[in-house]
Amino acid sequence: MSKLLIPLLALAPAFAQDPRQIILEVQKRQHSDSQRYEGTLEVISQGNQVATKRWTYQRIGSFGNSKAILRFTAPAEVKGVGLLIVNHPDRASDQWMWRPAIGRDQRIALQDRSTRFFGTDFSFEDLEERDVDQYDYKLLADEGATWKIESRPRKSSQYAYSYFWIKKDNYTFVRIEAYSKKGLVRTIDYKDQEQIQGIWTARVTEVYDVARKSRTILKYEKLDYNLPMKDDDFTLQALRREL
Amino acid sequence: MTIASVLLTVLAAQSFEQRGFVENRTTAYPQTAPNDSGHVVDEILVREDASYKLTPWLTVNGGFDARMDSHRQTAREWVLNADDRSIPRPPFSLRRLSATMHRGRVTAEIGRQLIRWGKTDILNPTDRFAPRDYLSSVVDADFLGVSAARVTYESGGETIDLVWQPWFTPSRTPLLNQRWTVVPPQAAGVNVVDAGARYPGGSQYGARWNHIGAGYEYSLCFFDGFQNLPSFDVLFSPMTQTAALTRVYPQLRLYGGDAAVPLRWLTLKGEAAYFTSSTPGAEEYALYVIQLERQVKEWSFAGGYAGSAVTREAANPLQFAPDRGFAKSFVGRAGLTIDANRDLAIESAVRAGGSFVRFEYSQLFGQHWRATGGIAWIRGDMADFLGQYRRNSYGSLAIRYSF
């Protein structure tokens, strides 16, 4: 072992115990310049009624400073409905929804981001990315295979705080519990993790809306990273261009 | 070899997208009208929209309607109508047939297309390239396509939109012998005849600049063209007691703007336009809308006031003007998403002399079927724009299969 590695290894555990550094490491390991997938969503209501939706998702840019377009492909009546998300490192994202049936886009105001997105259990806020510097972190527990970290948003959010569970071996999210001042609002579980193009990726995300007792299971298909994409395809004009 | 590789590249980039629906809508009117004894109207509409991406920068778009109804609102002819100027609805019409090209920050669409301007939801004074089909309902009108060339330049938060419309497309008005045309009591005993329309010959153009800031956005726009809502020229024959009505469309120039500003609890939206006209005797006026909206959990609310101010009175009082008819109204809309499949909506407009309220319940069945049931209640004085339709309260049921 080289002399250089010895102090680095000695530092590693202490370094890893800093929750902000853990989150930074998560972002670093999941970094990609672009991402594309086709998602199948099953929205399961309290009465076990299942509604199935599909969307395509494309993102360009690095985490927290990216642009994404999400477009429904099913059911037939919402085909073409799109959402443009422009994430900013220093503030909440800008979001616009496009409804081709009426030919209008609608800006989603910040105070409306806690609303569920198109009947799913995701809120508009859940679809945005916020940079690591928009939160304060606290390491709550070392639970063997995972760290439990508390995050508190520095800027406006529907959530007062959240708990993250992060796997130690591959620095991926396992679970998020998101709380308002009144209590638990939403849980998000990341399942079926596998390496895609060297990036550990959950193939299934399950969101549970505590108040509605409703679940949305998002399955990722045809997921690729680092595809060639252009900035011009992530603008309001691009959102309107598609059918 | 080079040609083959270019062709392969083009073919690989091609993609076809489509969506459409078949809808049967039944509307029941408990009351008859003086010019319409029908109680039930059934309409069938097939709508198909498709796009074909030939290259990454070129897409061809098509939109097609086929329709029929039980009340002679649709012409009984087997002709494809490409300009949507007919007095009755055409059985087959092109809503869209256009090519969209984009390169860098510029997007151009040429051909028949839908163009929407404005930010408010209840009434859009600046939405001048969007004629509507009021034939079977003044309170629930669909949009018509226009033949135009549109070039949009987008850079960061700035967007400039230039539109040139060489052929005029009017809004479609209610048929004279049906309930959504209310013949004034003074014309009782007069035989009212539809003498068609005199369409203006020139082109229309407009420009809009939109600015997106951190959380807010606003735009300014200009339009020079024609009013797509008609005034009526009357030719009265005392011998036969016949009044022949011809639709005419005054010249119109618009200076307008709109803005959306999120406040702490609500989003404030406003839209205003001032209309002038070089046509002698045509009205000059301003329309404005102030609207507040908010989403709270599964509820969405939008409410506000639509106002108007006339700066030059019209010499011709015979006009079909739902945009001004809905002005001087308090308007509101509330929607509830019950779950992933069920929605509820309430919409209302209240004026000094008339009011309108509509309830709608909608449910999706499986992946394709949706049923929407509604009740609309209209009340008011005969002298009021809304109140004159007080015999047109209705219940409706629409069954839609989307594909």
Residue ranges of predicted features:
Chain A
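Short, solvent-exposed mixed-charge patches
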Residues: E242-L243
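Short, ordered beta-strand-loop transition motifs
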Residues: I60-S66, L139-T146, I196-Q197
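N-terminal mature ectodomain segment of secretory-pathway/periplasmic proteins
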Residues: D18-P100
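Short structured motifs
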Residues: Q21-L24, T40, K53-T56, D133-L139, ...
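Gly/Pro-enriched, hydrophobic low-complexity segments
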Residues: A16, L24, T73, L84, ...
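Hydrophobic h-region of N-terminal signal peptides that target proteins for export
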Residues: L8-A16
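Sec-dependent signal peptide recognition
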Residues: M1-L8
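Short, flexible active-site-adjacent loop segments at beta-strand->alpha-helix junctions, enriched
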Residues: P89, A101, Q111-D112, D136
